[in-house]
Amino acid sequence: MDYSCGNYMKMVQVKGNSTVEIKDVDKPSLGSHDIFVKMQACGICGSDVEKVFGKYGQPSMRLGHEPAGIITQIGSEVKNFNIGDRVFTHHHVACYSDDCHECSHGNETMCKNFYESNLEPCGLADEYIVPEWNLTHDGVLKLPDHISFEEAAMIEPLACCIRAWNKFQYQKNDSIAILGVGPTGIMHAMLAKLYGFAQIFCLDLNDFRLDYAKKFETMTIRSDNPNVTEIIKSETGNQGVDVVIVSTSSMEALQDAFSFVRKGGTVVMFGVPSKGTKIDLDMSKIYSKEINIVNSYAASDFDTKDALEKISSKKINVKQLITHKYHLDESQKAFEHARSGDNAMKIIINS
């Protein structure tokens, strides 16, 4: 079967003024160690929305880093992959070398190769190149037949959540508050349930998403409720929660997190803040209460493999998060929907 798109391909890029454009471009040449993948599904991430609608949007900015698809062509020197293979492709891939300070210390997402590697021209294209570096450093995972491409497009965001969880200590029957219950916020709730947390509080301003969170046996609270801190403390024996995950870019949410985390608890900064953002914190309070602050950026290929296993084994049912699908030609409409969040969780683009 011929899966190729021919000599031309479509890609989506930032046009400026809060718009995207779909461009027909010449298909780039395939290197002897590269592969072409026909995108079947790609999720829209909050960082993609920020690129389009935020103050950092600029023409030609690449979009899409959650793609999965079918291999359409392979370079002459490629081993272990074949045309027709169904794959997840990771955009950034570290070196994993013992000689790399970052990788050898478990900070793979800080590796310079992680930043320099990528899919070409981007994941949000009907076809894209996976370069040799990604291919030979575990950046491509073959998919079991029972996993759909839409599920595979959820591997990367779930992997990001898993990486965050690997950065702090917790115990069964602990309590957690998740601030911001978009797709990754719900994934954090799913992981908390999987890991045996006794109390899961979900906070947001979006009533649709709060109602959605109730499906996962959580206690939901509007984050603008003036009694949030009192409610959480009353439910936790006046102690506060063991863990707070801030799964939003809101700095107000980050500040609020310190008001209802317990002594010796952990605040996880997961949502992506805007560049240059600053907040005021009472460092004396943080010090005296021994509050741990953890940051988590992106995911390594250890995390993507873990995410694939959790999805494949049905430990995490990511299908529950997919509410809308759009065709590549409808990308502008898809991004506007993702920005509004109206009755939506995860939005997937298909080609």
PLM features: residue spans?
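Short glycine-centered segments of the SAM/dcSAM-binding site in methyltransferase folds
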Residues: 86, 175, 265-266, 292
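C-terminal hydrophobic helical "lid"/dimerization subdomain
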Residues: 2-7, 226, 255-259, 301-351
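Residues in the short beta-alpha loop(s) of Rossmann-like NAD(P)-binding domains
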Residues: 205-206, 273, 299
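Mid-domain Rossmann-like dinucleotide-binding core that forms the NAD(H)/NADP(H) cofactor-binding site
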Residues: 145-226, 230
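Glycine-rich cofactor phosphate-binding loops and adjacent beta1-alpha1 units
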Residues: 168, 211, 216-290
